[in-house]
Every structure is written in C-alpha cells, then in structure tokens.
Amino acid sequence: MKPSLIIVTFIVVFMAISCVAADDEQETWIEKRGDCLPHLKRCKENNDCCSKKCKRRGTNPEKRCR
C-alpha cells in the first residue's frame, strides 16, 4: 500500500511542476512577442516603438505609435 502511495504522490508532484513550468514558458513567449499589439501599438518606456514613429495623442501623457 505504501509504495503505491509514494508513486501517486510522485505523479501529482510531477504534474504540478509541469504545469508551473508551462505557465512560465507561456509568459516568456508573450514577453518575446513584444509590447506592441497589432491594433494598438504602444511605445515602450524608453520611447522605442515598433513602427519607430511615436507621437503624443491628446492630453494623455502615454505615447502611442502611429
């Protein structure tokens, strides 16, 4: 009975670690994709933009790409 309990515990721990690793991988992929969305391309904090043409829009201090 105890060996089967150890095996089940090992499987559950392995699955939990796999799920956490998959979430980290997905976040890394999203970061690599970039900060710019296709429909609303935002400038980065250092004013570097996907289209390299940043301009202020309206009274909002946040800059956006055009």
UniProtKB/Swiss-Prot annotation:
<feature type="propeptide">
    <location>
        <begin position="23"/>
        <end position="31"/>
    </location>
</feature>
<feature type="disulfide bond">
    <location>
        <begin position="36"/>
        <end position="50"/>
    </location>
</feature>
<feature type="site" description="Essential for stimulation of [3H]ryanodine binding to RYR1">
    <location>
        <position position="64"/>
    </location>
</feature>
<feature type="site" description="Essential for stimulation of [3H]ryanodine binding to RYR1">
    <location>
        <position position="66"/>
    </location>
</feature>
<feature type="signal peptide">
    <location>
        <begin position="1"/>
        <end position="22"/>
    </location>
</feature>
<dbReference type="GO" id="GO:0005576">
    <property type="term" value="C:extracellular region"/>
</dbReference>
<comment type="function">
    <text>This toxin stabilizes ryanodine receptor 1 (RyR1) opening in a long-lasting subconductance state (35% of the full conductance state). Furthermore, it triggers calcium release from sarcoplasmic vesicles (2 nM are enough to induce a sharp release, and 67% of the total calcium is released after toxin (100 nM) addition) probably by acting as a cell-penetrating peptide (CPP). In addition, it has been shown to dose-dependently stimulate ryanodine binding to RyR1 (EC(50)=0.3 nM).</text>
</comment>
<protein>
    <recommendedName>
        <fullName>Opicalcin-1</fullName>
    </recommendedName>
</protein>
<keyword id="KW-0872">Ion channel impairing toxin</keyword>
<feature type="region of interest" description="Essential for stimulation of [3H]ryanodine binding to RYR1">
    <location>
        <begin position="55"/>
        <end position="57"/>
    </location>
</feature>
<keyword id="KW-0528">Neurotoxin</keyword>
<keyword id="KW-0108">Calcium channel impairing toxin</keyword>
<keyword id="KW-0165">Cleavage on pair of basic residues</keyword>
<dbReference type="InterPro" id="IPR012632">
    <property type="entry name" value="Scorpion_calcine"/>
</dbReference>
<keyword id="KW-1219">Ryanodine-sensitive calcium-release channel impairing toxin</keyword>
<keyword id="KW-0800">Toxin</keyword>
<dbReference type="Pfam" id="PF08099">
    <property type="entry name" value="Toxin_27"/>
</dbReference>
<feature type="disulfide bond">
    <location>
        <begin position="43"/>
        <end position="54"/>
    </location>
</feature>
<feature type="disulfide bond">
    <location>
        <begin position="49"/>
        <end position="65"/>
    </location>
</feature>
<keyword id="KW-1015">Disulfide bond</keyword>
<dbReference type="GO" id="GO:0090729">
    <property type="term" value="F:toxin activity"/>
</dbReference>
<comment type="similarity">
    <text>Belongs to the scorpion calcin family.</text>
</comment>
<keyword id="KW-0960">Knottin</keyword>
<keyword id="KW-0732">Signal</keyword>
<dbReference type="GO" id="GO:0019855">
    <property type="term" value="F:calcium channel inhibitor activity"/>
</dbReference>
<keyword id="KW-0964">Secreted</keyword>
